[in-house]
């Protein structure tokens, strides 16, 4: 039965699914006294733990002593609004242990849900984080009045920027043109369900960042991710003009219109 007793829920579970926004994950887990070491933890969170500048997978691994074979991810491209309405949706289940990935897929199985599997924990998780930042940039562009022609260029460059970050920060044999990377980026940038696109749209329409955040009824992970990625990229020094533009607008009070105009000279 549903319960707000975190210890009781975790004690009785063999699989623990985390779906709280990343900004509140530490506080959410703080009361937990039941060990997670013998559990399998699945993250449905698309963000970075602020202050620690770790992905959720890294944070659970380091702070709760789980091996990467005990931690999984569930990512899109998928909006819950369509899943709840029975629309055909695709999920990607990610785990270093392929058998555990399939085990999770079986738990999420449904009539209108298809699955793909991956072992690229780092790449898929960072792709899911970055796409929220890029959806913010798309929302800003739409709010400023840019058209479909420009959006196509912006999103194509975002896909390239995402791939460049993954290749330079954690080289691996990965195909970023598949649904876990490119598909998730596309749906988050284009869908009217996208919270991050919505936040960017409000800013593009002229709202201050503070007032835009207050207008949101749900958390837009891209707001927190923009700051975290900025800090993480100090180590890697990857050229990320789109993510940098979003950071400047959100955290430095820079003009969205001016920043977008400057960005147009850096896109190909």
Across the structure, where does each feature detected by a protein language model lie?
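Alpha-helix C-terminal capping/helix-to-coil transition sites in glycosyltransferase folds
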Residues: 11-12, 130, 182
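NAD(P)-dependent Rossmann-like dehydrogenase/reductase catalytic/cofactor-binding core
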Residues: 138-142, 167-268
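Fold-independent oxyanion-binding glycine-rich loops
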Residues: 5, 20-21, 44-46, 74-77, ...
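Electropositive phosphate-/nucleotide-binding environments in soluble metabolic enzymes
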Residues: 3, 19-22, 26, 35, ...
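Internal alpha-helical scaffold of NAD(P)-dependent oxidoreductase catalytic cores
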Residues: 24, 35, 59-69, 88-175
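General beta-strand structural signal in soluble alpha/beta enzymes
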Residues: 43, 69-75, 115-119, 177, ...
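Rossmann-like NAD(P)(H) cofactor-binding subdomain of soluble oxidoreductases
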Residues: 3-11, 15-86, 104-106
């Amino acid at each position: 039965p549903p319960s707000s007793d975190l210890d009781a829920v975790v004690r009785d579970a063999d699989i623990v699914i985390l779906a709280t926004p990343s900004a509140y994950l530490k506080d959410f887990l703080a009361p937990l006294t039941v060990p997670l070491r013998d559990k399998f933890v699945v993250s449905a969170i698309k963000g970075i733990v602020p202050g620690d500048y770790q992905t959720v997978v890294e944070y659970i691994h380091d702070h709760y002593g789980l091996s990467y074979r005990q931690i999984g991810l569930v990512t899109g491209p998928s909006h819950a609004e369509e899943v709840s309405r029975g629309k055909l949706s695709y999920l990607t289940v990610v785990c270093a242990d392929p058998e555990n990935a399939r085990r999770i897929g079986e738990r999420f199985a449904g009539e209108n849900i298809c699955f793909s599997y991956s072992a690229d924990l780092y790449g898929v998780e960072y792709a899911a984080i970055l796409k929220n930042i890029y959806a913010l940039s798309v929302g800003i562009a739409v709010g400023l009045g840019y058209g479909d022609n420009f959006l196509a260029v912006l999103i194509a460059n975002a896909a390239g920027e995402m791939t460049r970050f993954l290749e330079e920060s954690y080289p691996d044999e990965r195909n970023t043109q598949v649904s876990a990377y490119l598909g998730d980026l596309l749906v988050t940038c284009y869908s009217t369900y996208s919270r991050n696109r919505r936040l960017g749209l409000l800013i593009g329409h002229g709202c201050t960042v503070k007032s835009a955040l207050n207008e949101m009824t749900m958390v837009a992970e891209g707001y927190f991710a923009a700051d975290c990625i900025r800090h993480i990229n100090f180590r890697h020094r990857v050229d990320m003009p789109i993510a940098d533009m979003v950071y400047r607008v959100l955290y430095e009070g820079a003009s969205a219109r001016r920043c977008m105009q400057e960005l147009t000279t850096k896109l190909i």
